[in-house]
């Protein structure tokens, strides 16, 4: 396997990247940042996917594995969610991922290019910094749970995700299918926070903050910060982490791909904490 660097806005670099390649794993995307105009996110996540599909087909690529996101489903009412759960994207990133996924599926059908789509859940582990703020706030003692903490959230350790993605590229039964890739089971936010606290040898505060006023505060922060191109210190999507359930079944990936996550929550969070510490981040 070869890691290719390029620009999804530059077809010439894409052609160079796929030349002589049998299989493409498309994992590049623009993520959530306030300074990024929404049309730029669409240009990267949707048009960039279209361009990569076209040059891959022209180059004779035999399989195209596309990274989507469980975020296309939004909150999961009556969990667990499955690959067939309705789409309900909640922001620009999720909407572009949903559009790109449909585009990839339709392109495969129209042009005969074998497409495999995977939707990862919350990815954590070495080299991922999205959960660093949570670790820091727990370690420093300033963390306060927003809401009850009983909302379900499902995560996947990065090495387990890599195993699942490789199976998407090698399984004979994968083409034409969509797979949710996440850990074996969801956990409450209380459990996740308590497990992080154990990695740091600290006790969590039992004090909780009501979710509704924090959500309103997030909306106000967005109203003030977004016109200025500033990342809000608090925004509704962050509060939604504490409010909306995201729990999924991986039964399809287990049965079709033989997917079997190996790293449980306690081990994965400890490995993540150790990496943060080794990098001087925590």
Regions found by a protein language model. Name each.
Residues 99, 128-133, 146-169, 176-177, ...:
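Substrate-positioning beta->alpha
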Residues 44-49, 65-68, 96-97, 154:
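Short alpha-helix in the Rossmann-fold core of NAD(P)-dependent oxidoreductases
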Residues 167-234, 250, 266, 270-271, ...:
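Mid/C-terminal beta-alpha module of Rossmann-like enzyme folds, strongest
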Residues 51-93:
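Conserved Rossmann-fold NAD(P)-dependent oxidoreductase catalytic core, especially the SDR/UDP-sugar
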Residues 1, 5-47, 55, 70-75:
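NAD(P)H-binding glycine-rich loop region in Rossmannoid oxidoreductase-like domains
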Residues 90-119:
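Active-site Tyr-X1-5-Lys
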Residues 73-74, 113-132:
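Flexible, glycine-rich beta-alpha linker
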């Amino acid at each position: 396997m070869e890691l290719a660097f390029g620009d999804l806005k530059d077809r010439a670099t894409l052609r160079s990247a796929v030349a002589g390649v049998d299989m493409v794993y498309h994992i590049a995307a623009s993520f959530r940042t306030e300074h990024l105009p929404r049309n730029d996110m669409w240009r990267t996540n949707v048009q960039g996917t279209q361009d990569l599909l076209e040059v891959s087909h022209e180059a004779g690529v035999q399989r195209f594995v596309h990274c989507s996101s469980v975020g296309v489903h939004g909150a999961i009412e009556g969990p667990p969610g499955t690959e067939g759960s309705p789409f309900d994207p909640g922001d620009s990133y999720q909407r572009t991922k949903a559009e790109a996924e449909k585009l990839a599926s339709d392109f495969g059908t129209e042009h005969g290019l074998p497409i495999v789509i995977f939707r990862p859940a919350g990815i954590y582990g070495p080299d991922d910094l999205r959960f660093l703020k949570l670790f820091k706030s727990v370690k420093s003692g300033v963390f306060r749970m927003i809401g009850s903490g009983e909302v379900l959230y499902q995560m996947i350790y990065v090495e387990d995700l890599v195993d699942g993605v490789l199976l998407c590229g090698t399984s004979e039964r994968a083409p034409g299918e969509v797979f949710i890739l996440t850990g074996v089971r969801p956990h409450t936010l209380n459990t996740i926070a308590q497990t992080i606290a154990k990695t740091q040898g600290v006790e969590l505060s039992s004090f909780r903050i009501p979710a509704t006023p924090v959500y309103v505060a997030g909306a106000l922060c967005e109203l003030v910060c977004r016109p200025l191109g500033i990342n809000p210190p608090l925004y509704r999507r962050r509060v939604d982490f504490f409010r909306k359930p995201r729990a999924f079944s991986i039964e399809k990936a287990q049965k079709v791909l033989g997917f079997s996550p190996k790293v449980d929550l306690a081990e994965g969070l400890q490995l993540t904490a150790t990496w943060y510490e080794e990098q001087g981040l925590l």
